[in-house]
Amino acid sequence: MSNDNQLDKKSQAWSALFSEPMSELVKRYTASVDFDQRLWRADIDGSLAHAEMLAAQGILTAEDHAAIVRGMAQVVAEIESGAFEWKLDLEDVHLNIEARLTQLVGDAGKRLHTGRSRNDQVATDVRLWLRGEIDAIGALLSALQRALVDVAEPNAEVILPGFTHLQVAQPVSFGHHLLAYVEMFARDAERLLDVRRRVNRLPLGAAALAGTSYPLDRERVARTLGFDGVCQNSLDAVSDRDFAIEFTAAASLCMVHVSRLSEELILWMSQSFGFIDLADRFCTGSSIMPQKKNPDVPELARGKTGRVVGHLMALITLMKGQPLAYNKDNQEDKEPLFDTVDTLKDTLRIFAELVGGISVKPEAMERAALKGYATATDLADYLVKKGLPFRDAHEVVAHAVKTAIAQGRDLSELPLPALQAFHPAITDDVHAALTLRGSLDARQVLGGTAPAQVRFQIARHRTRLGS
């Protein structure tokens, strides 16, 4: 029999039923090959596992199986070299690969689709692809966490004004502040691992929606492809996109954490704060103002966060009105998912490098901490330790701060008699509690900002991250 590609002749795999060809406009509107071709490796891996199982079950002959393996190797070589011709008429990655395989090996290529539908095929492809991307993102998250820890360690003693409501609140270690983001990104990594468990289920064998009459060994295919198990309901297997939504939700939250870090980097770099500087390679200038150094990378990351969150909303909206089982709507899951992966990976990769290029300005940080009466809580705690109820101590200190503001002084600059006027329990040991360093060192509670605690957490993170 001729090896001419029957799919090419018919234009589509279902054309025998139809009396007129699909219009060119509809072809362009419905084709997905321009973007789903990135699934080619997963598609071929899934097909090879399916073919191996068909042969083991006696559904494919050994000769046909060998031909498929040989032909797929040629397809892989062509795709990797750029010689493979992706055809719009063949609509998607699946039919393009099947068509080329059939050109190469003849009828054996036509038998590959036995017991399979594109519905369970694409669900398998996306899960395989996404599983690999989750693993890659996990590695990037680890690299970003290590970069933050590397900057936190030499800055454990550096005093930064801690803020609530963007008002100076209490002094904190700059290293401690950076470790807060390590905690966020660690949770992101945990969430992605949890999502991966639900991604790692095999839909193949569900066929179009009802399963198949062929004696397929789905567990064998799952083992071959490294899946933890198989999807247990054929209708759900082909129509489920929860895993894509879950992943995009986890990615959105990760980008939100990047955006929060970006916002702080932007503020800290501004002249109003002047706490840090970013390396020139992450900034741009102005076409009109020669003095400008703009933090474009964190600004753009802040903007891209909205894009990823938008993809999450798109996927949720895509699924909300679909009846079981597969619908063409689901073709619209790929571009948001693909772009989410690309955006997140690029962002994490660049931020690991950006964080390592931060120049810290400790003097500016300490000056800012001194301006905001950051040790007021320490004075209240001092009075509590002298026997006052906290609410009474709070009121006493509020009066002291009001006086200090009127005199243009920090609390630590008020003389002892002035402080004793607010409460007689205040003695000459009070000034040790009112220094920024004293405030920092006092917070020895587990998870606190005392440098010793910061170093303890750094050691914990290094052990966890293997660095």
Curated annotation (Swiss-Prot):
Pathway named in the protein's UniProt entry: Amino-acid biosynthesis; L-arginine biosynthesis; L-arginine from L-ornithine and carbamoyl phosphate: step 3/3
Major enzyme class: lyase
Record EC number: 4.3.2.1
KW Signal (keyword) present: no
Reactions accelerated catalytically: 2-(N(omega)-L-arginino)succinate = fumarate + L-arginine
Keyword Cytoplasm: yes
Molecular function as annotated in GO: argininosuccinate lyase activity
PROSITE patterns: FUMARATE_LYASES
Gene Ontology CC annotations of this record: cytosol
Name this protein carries in UniProt: Argininosuccinate lyase
